[in-house]
Amino acid sequence: MLFFTSCFNGSRELEVPKSKHIYINSISSASSTELRVKAGITIPLIGANGNSENDIELSAHHNSTPIVVKKDGASFIIKLDRELNANDEISLIATSEGIPSISTVARVLGAPKLLRAKGEWVHFDEGSSRVQVKLSIEPTKEVAYYRLIVRSKWYSESLGVSPGTLLERKIVTLGNPLFPQQKDQLFNEVNNAPFALLSLKNESDVTFSYYDVKLENSPDAPVKMDWEYSAEVELQRISKDYYLYLLTCMDSENNNAFENPIKIHSNIIGGFGIFEIYTPLTTPILIK
């Protein structure tokens, strides 16, 4: 694997590595008792030989207490005996013979406090509608960083579509366009889906909208369908490092790498990648 982004504990300009380095990518929820850590070795453009991903050794600590790490292919599995709480820390050290060791720490932040989420259908045109949502969050004294995800679904018992049907993630547009929505497609191979980023301080109300299809019975329809609608918002409290990582990944997607140097933020000391444990909170959107 060739890496064309240099991420040594911060942002640097585009650079093809002249020597091998360890990279780590791990994004997990604090509500999980299993952390999966992807690890590998960057390969110089010329003279690639020697170490493979199988040569990496990983050690982990939970609040300075060693924890068991198991190898699973190119990944490592860390089993925890409980869910993580605010201010818990997980630290990692990865080594491989002849390559500089790397280290990183993820600290769990307090869960966001959602006060309410109210939505309203505000526009529909040719089958495409929009839901305007006002999200009220308990303000924080310091700057807080969030990733916002919206899911929705239609269901009908008479048509055999149960309330348990999985919700579909929606494209989110912020009312105050802080940042455009993007797709989480770097280092997230399974759940390619839209999200929005927020940075807030002493603010409690966030306005955003998302597009959906509004199913309505025609007044002259002989049979009325019992469609029901459900939507929810997931607010993830994330670290400043992960926030900057996502922003710089967005920039690298939107810019021409051969015209503008790519800068990808990292919290891996001595290597590449990101280590993040976010704190999620999901609440239903009450829609008129």
Where does each model-flagged region fall?
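A sequence/structural signal for flexible, mid-protein segments enriched
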Residues: 7-288
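Sec-dependent bacterial lipoprotein signal peptides
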Residues: 1-6
